[in-house]
Amino acid sequence: MHIAWLGKKSPFCGNVTYGREVTNSLLDRGYEVSFLHFAQEEADSDTWFGCQEVSLPFLYKSQIYTIPTLTASKVLTRSLKQLRPDIVHASLTLSPLDFLLPEICEELNLPLVATFHPPFDGKRRNLKSGTQLFTYQLYAPFLAHYDRVIVFSQLQRNFLVKLGVPLEKLAVIPNGVDVQKYSPGASNLKSQWNARHLFVYQGRISTEKNVEALLKAWKQSNLGDSCKLVIVGNGPLSASLMPFYGEEYGIIWLGFVADEQRRIEILRAADVFILPSLLEGLSLSLLEAMACGVACVATDAGADGEVLEDGAGVILNTHRVASQLHTLLPVFRDHLEWRTLLGQKARARVLERYTLSRNITQLEKLYAEVLRLQRVHLSTRA
């Protein structure tokens, strides 16, 4: 089977990781994959091996959205005609091209699958979640024209059904982690940072990630010199937060860490992983930390609460996150046995529900079903 994958290679975000892990796994299972992405010609050519690549022209791209050039749809159509894939899988990049894809693929008689990533909070508890609701409302009528739309949780599926996307169009296939790579193991980073207790945040430094609530709680808790908070990632709020939350409070800013093995070492050294988001989809960073056997704390935004339910971690309400963390941080510092138990439960939850291997097997079944329905559809038109 030949899969034309439309996704992202830069700038780094969860969508980039998702595309890399899934396409590499499909290649490992013997599929042919062509990778179409927004890039300048010859750019980013060293990240994916074994894929034929097609660069689509763009005016602007960020971690959140992409603005293609006016010729991008023509380049995409021409490329799909030349590649002649069996199926197109779009890991949606929040681009105007997303709305044209169903029409393009219908014209070429190509079945079309999408993965819909945008974070959400189905309870609409804050301004950010109201803004994100608009994205879902905007996309829902167009998602109905895709052959299948992959979402990461039952909660997200139910949310889209309420917005009018037919239930039969939606498939729940959660994010998955390579549990051989992301696993408990030795790390000497604690000694390097002179930390007895290590707390970690990994993700974008942006409003929806609510990192300032964590920083405020950390500063107010005054946990002592033996505790360190490591912030992995960058984003629009980094420059405004770093001057007020620095090393004098035991906070270590690492910025974006490109080396995956280094990120794994950080997670293996961590005692607690904290994700204070106001909005989420299903956080890969959270799953990676859980797979490494780290005790995890996250809000119930998006599907993260579903991941940690029934004792696999500590779930926060998106209201008053700083206050909740102010109470929890000293408890985590003082109770090793609880941290250890939560870490074991987190790893077990990932092994049960969120392995990359399981994810790819579900995806294979979805592709087979979509292709079967496509053949039936074409035969009835003949």
Predicted regions and their residues:
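Conserved donor-binding/catalytic core segment of Leloir-type glycosyltransferases
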Residues: 4, 192-219, 230
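Aromatic "clamp/platform" in nucleotide-sugar-dependent glycosyltransferases that forms part
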Residues: 278
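Carbohydrate-associated surface elements
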Residues: 155, 176
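Nucleotide-activated donor-binding/catalytic signature segment of Leloir-type glycosyltransferases, i.e.
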Residues: 239-258
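Short alpha-helical donor nucleotide-sugar binding micro-motif in glycosyltransferases
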Residues: 256, 265-270
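Conserved acidic donor-binding segment of nucleotide-sugar-dependent glycosyltransferases
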Residues: 310, 314-322, 331-336
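Nucleotide-sugar donor phosphate/pyrophosphate-binding loop at the beta->alpha transition
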Residues: 111, 121-145
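Short hydrophobic beta-strand element within catalytic cores of glycosyltransferases
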Residues: 295-298
